[in-house]
Curated annotation (Swiss-Prot):
InterPro entries: ATP_syn_F0_a_bact/chloroplast, ATP_synth_F0_asu, ATP_synth_F0_asu_AS, F0_ATP_A_sf. It comes from the Bacteria. SUPFAM superfamilies: F1F0 ATP synthase subunit A (SSF81336). One of its GO terms (molecular function) is proton-transporting ATP synthase activity, rotational mechanism. This is ATP synthase subunit a 1. Belongs to the ATPase A chain family. Key component of the proton channel; it plays a direct role in the translocation of protons across the membrane. The keyword Thylakoid applies. Pfam families: ATP-synt_A. Keywords: ATP synthesis, CF(0), Hydrogen ion transport, Ion transport, Membrane, Thylakoid, Transmembrane, Transmembrane helix, Transport.
Amino acid sequence: MLNSLTTFSLFPLAELEVGKHFYWELGGLKVHGQVLMTSWFVIAVLVLASILATRNVQRVPGGFQNFMEYALEFIRDLAKNQLGEKEYRPWVPFIGTLFLFIFIANWSGALVPWKIIGLPEGELAAPTNDINTTVALALLTSLAYFYAGFKKRGIGYLKKYLEPTPILLPINILEDFTKPLSLSFRLFGNILADELVVGVLVFLVPLIIPLPLMALGLFASAIQALIFATLAAAYIAEAMEGHH
């Protein structure tokens, strides 16, 4: 029995390290190496899924092609519901990329045994467990809705800051700063909290007991991806329509 416990302890599934990072030096800048590694993993999964789904396209889809077409239809409907029939098509790739990246990134934190991969410092985790990732995604969303607004309305897009009255100019400007903040911190907080809670429970009690909470975490992670993509589409639609 003691030998079994010793063997099990070789795999630090519940070891928690908060605030430590594995840094890479790139051009004189320090970047979080573990975030780049897990992000590349997520991107590789998405690229591989795309290749498998389009390698031998059939008129009557089946298997993995059928699953990917269902995912594409779901993303298309999401964009259509938020942006409308006339405007949604150019934005399907952007909204879909956001949703799929966040979805796979969130689930990788629960399904991939990152803890057994040792690093000199810090530990591997879901990319969305790092505030830098969520802020980057939120800033991309901000750039997207500014681009959509200026492309659709030209310089007239700036009139939105004076609506419905010029007195609200400071509040309207502040709103553009709070949107990416709320997007990034909501996603970061939910994913970090989920991984910390599951990690503590696995550390304190047997593996079987935290399983229901892990399942709930997978569901919540999927919902967070949906919320982020839906809000991104809604912000883009708002920028093009010119009203709140």
